[in-house]
Amino acid sequence: MAKKPETLSRIADNKKAAFNYFFEERHEAGMVLHGWEVKALREGKVQLTDGYVVIREGELYLIGCQINPLKTASTHVSPDAVRTKKLLLHKDEIKRLTAKVEQKGYTLVPLNLHWTNGRAKCEIALAKGKAEHDKRDTIKEREGKREVERAMKSRHR
C-alpha cells in the first residue's frame, strides 16, 4: 500500500523572528505536551512571539511560548499557560547546535508551530541578531515591494 503524503498545517508563526534575526539553519523539533495543550493548539490558542529556545544539560527547552487553555478542556488540572516545553531533537543535532550557540551572537529562536502527520512540531532556527541598520533595510525593502505591487495593481485596472 502506498504511503500517504505528508500533511503540514501551520498553527502559529513567529513573524517578529524574521524581522529581528538572520537565519542560518532550520530544524524541526518534536514537542513534549500535555493533553490540554494539544487541544488548545488545535484551536489555535497559542502565542509564539515572546518565545525563545535554551539548551540546558544537553536538552532543548522552549520558554515563553504561551498556550492559553480552553475553558472546557482542562477542568481537573490547573494549567500553566507559559509552561516550559521540552523540544525533541537527535543528540548529534543538539551537540552541533550547542557548539554554534556558544559562539558570540548566535541564538535559537522558534519560527513556527505546525502539525506534521498529526504531531505538533516546532520549527527552530539557529539565528544571528540583526543590527538596527539591517532592520531599517528590511523595512525599506518591504515598503518598496508594496509600492511596486500597488503600481502594478493600478495599471491593470
Curated annotation (Swiss-Prot):
Location of this chain's protein in the cell: Cytoplasm
GO molecular function, one term: RNA binding
Annotated InterPro entries: SmpB (IPR023620), SsrA-bd_prot (IPR000037), SsrA-bd_prot_CS (IPR020081)
SUPFAM superfamilies cross-referenced by the UniProt entry: Small protein B (SmpB)
Keyword Disulfide bond recorded: no
GO terms of biological process kind: trans-translation
Region called Disordered, residue ranges: 132-157
Pfam families from the UniProt entry: SmpB (PF01668)
Domain of life: Bacteria
Key words of the record: Cytoplasm, RNA-binding
GO cellular component: cytosol
Similarity remark: Belongs to the SmpB family.
Function description: Required for rescue of stalled ribosomes mediated by trans-translation. Binds to transfer-messenger RNA (tmRNA), required for stable association of tmRNA with ribosomes. tmRNA and SmpB together mimic tRNA shape, replacing the anticodon stem-loop with SmpB. tmRNA is encoded by the ssrA gene; the 2 termini fold to resemble tRNA(Ala) and it encodes a 'tag peptide', a short internal open reading frame. During trans-translation Ala-aminoacylated tmRNA acts like a tRNA, entering the A-site of stalled ribosomes, displacing the stalled mRNA.
Name this polypeptide is given: SsrA-binding protein
Organism field: Paracidovorax citrulli (strain AAC00-1) (Acidovorax citrulli)
